[in-house]
């Protein structure tokens, strides 16, 4: 329960930051430098700004992308445990290089973003190309596989979370699932 509360708190903080940037003609850009988490966070925020979803959908997108990133990163940490697969993706010590972490994080974020914002796939493909990663399925490295596996596990779970993403988040609770007491 405490973990869930922490995740919800982080999502709310990110969402509040998003609300402060929506509608600005030139949003402030984070100086990402070499931090791939910031690079992919900016891709997520840019997608939200360009295709503004409802606030709850925006918060959900941020949570999914960052959970996929965390789960990919956790595979390369000796103690961290992924949210969906636990320690099942843990990589051997020899594989725990910065290059592998970067690649896994990028592939996880990429898959999550393409799933959430399919109309922007060309933008995400270009970002991956800029980072030196192929998105055509030719990269069969373990790091790419870790990223895809981590993201797929998160996406499979979130596709069943009741948000109805597959149908444009349409209300699937007709006539009404909730009847308030009078």
Residue ranges and their predicted role:
Residues 9-20:
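Bacterial N-terminal signal peptides
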